[in-house]
Design a protein with these regions (language model features):
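Alpha-helical scaffolding segments of alpha/beta enzyme cores, especially the outer helices
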Residues: 132-135, 139-142, 169-176
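Conserved SGNH/GDSL esterase-like catalytic core that processes O-acyl groups on lipids
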Residues: 46-48, 56-135
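Active-site segments of SGNH/GDSL-like serine hydrolases
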Residues: 116-122, 140-169, 190, 196
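Short amphipathic alpha-helices and their capping/turn segments at secondary-structure boundaries
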Residues: 30-43, 100-109, 138-143
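Residue-level recognition of beta-strand->loop/alpha-helix junctions
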Residues: 87-89, 153, 187-189
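Catalytic His-Asp segment of secreted/periplasmic serine-dependent ester chemistry enzymes
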Residues: 160-231
Length: 231
């Protein structure tokens, strides 16, 4: 009887986590979109973000748990400068959408001090080719301020694929492209892989990172973003 109650409670908790993750897709999007309409404040560092649901922070318990919020808070503290984020990412976005839709929004900003990009897992999930992914990404890199840009390589794709075989290979090819255009790379794969088997790294859908998982993303982005913004 007690065991059945415990199992039932666990099921309820898992369902609640999954529902929260689904809800966060729309709630985080609306929040970021509202902030993206705000004028740039005086005496702030401006960080623009492009990408998919990981850039939105889907999976985190609150939006403040997103890696963008976590890493900009850290860098803001270390540099003693306020940071204003313009997050143009879209949940479910592939690299092509980042190039065609999000990039023009970035170029509409009157100024930007750093650009953060994380996109690619949806290309894999939707079975797009590596060549089309790299072509879209190259379009992005040709049109961003390269000395102000840091991109993520691809993470292992959830606890069902802790080795992240395809994401590793795609990430290696992306690194070659980043080297060609002389942009910084945040080592997401390297930071996530040791914890890829740990379900606590993932949110309620066991695919997107949790707040804890996003702290690992923030670890990967912290140094390159700091290096860009302290110039």
């Amino acid at each position: 009887m007690i065991l059945a109650g415990v199992i039932a409670l666990l099921v309820v908790l898992l369902i609640a986590r999954a529902v929260h993750t689904l809800y966060s897709v729309s709630s985080y999007r609306k929040s970021w979109q509202t902030e993206a309409k705000s004028p740039i404040k005086k005496d702030v560092l401006v960080v623009a973000a492009l990408g998919d649901s990981t850039v939105q922070g889907v999976g985190a318990l609150t939006r403040s748990g997103s890696f963008i919020n976590q890493v900009t808070a850290r860098v803001s503290d270390s540099l003693d400068k306020d940071i204003q984020v313009y997050n143009f990412s879209v949940s479910g976005a592939e690299s092509g959408e980042a190039a065609d839709v999000q990039l023009p929004q970035l170029k509409g900003l009157e100024r930007v001090d750093a650009v953060v990009i994380a996109v690619g897992p949806n290309d894999l999930v939707h079975q797009k080719s590596l060549s089309s992914f790299l072509k879209s990404y190259e379009t992005i890199l040709k049109n961003v301020p390269r000395d102000k840009t840091v991109i993520a390589d691809l993470p292992p794709m959830g606890p069902k694929d802790p080795q992240g075989r395809d994401s590793y290979l795609w990430g290696q090819e992306l690194r070659k492209l980043a080297k060609k255009y002389d942009v910084r790379v945040a080592p997401i794969y390297e930071n996530i892989k040791p914890r890829a088997h740990d379900f606590r790294t993932y949110g309620g859908d066991f695919f997107h990172p949790s707040t804890t998982g996003y702290s690992l993303w923030a670890n990967a982005f912290e140094k390159p973003l700091t290096d860009i913004l302290k110039k």
